Amino acid sequence: MTTQKLPGTDAARHGTGAADLTIMLAAHDAFRRDLTRLARAAATADPSDPARRQSVAAGWELLKRQLHLHHTAEDQIIWPVLRPRLAHSEHALSVLDAMEAEHDLIDPLLAAVDTAFNVAPDQLADVIDALATTLTGHLAHEERDGLPLIGVALTAAEWRAAGRAIARKNGLSDGSEMFAWMLDGIGRDQAAATHGSLPPPLRLLYRAIWKPRFDKTPRW
């Protein structure tokens, strides 16, 4: 099994066949990290401080953007690739159906946080808690039941091809932001595992361009 054993994830413990899910798991951990940052910022930020409001808004918009890219890649590329390979398994298809349905549950919660930020700050803690509960539950479900299907259905080469399709769809701008976002503030071991999964030219771009550009914007 080639998947790195990243802290806080379930898929590495459950096993994923030949597929290297390092990047997928790093994104999941980044969502968990930013949910914690979101709750902390909402509880402590001074709404009368424009700079603080702007930094919290920048972090929140980035979280939403990365979540949209992540779920779009799953719904439009990963799950459709898996479905015909797993058509013989009612259980597998029911898991994929559940993954898509859970994505639909998350979108209204993102909108609710937006509304609370803008016009109902007294509701902010509750809606952030609802988002965190739903999203972390979805991530755990996906790691437990969804991601192992990738190793069942796809070879390592086929999984890499799916990754290239996602990269083409996202483009260099979104892809560079995604890697800088995933590596932001994570521990040394996890950063090394995630960074090491990149081809050498992209590692150089990350150090020279992507990370410095990402760090220019205050967040949270």
Could you say what each language-model-derived stretch is?
Residues M1-W220:
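Small-residue-biased structural context
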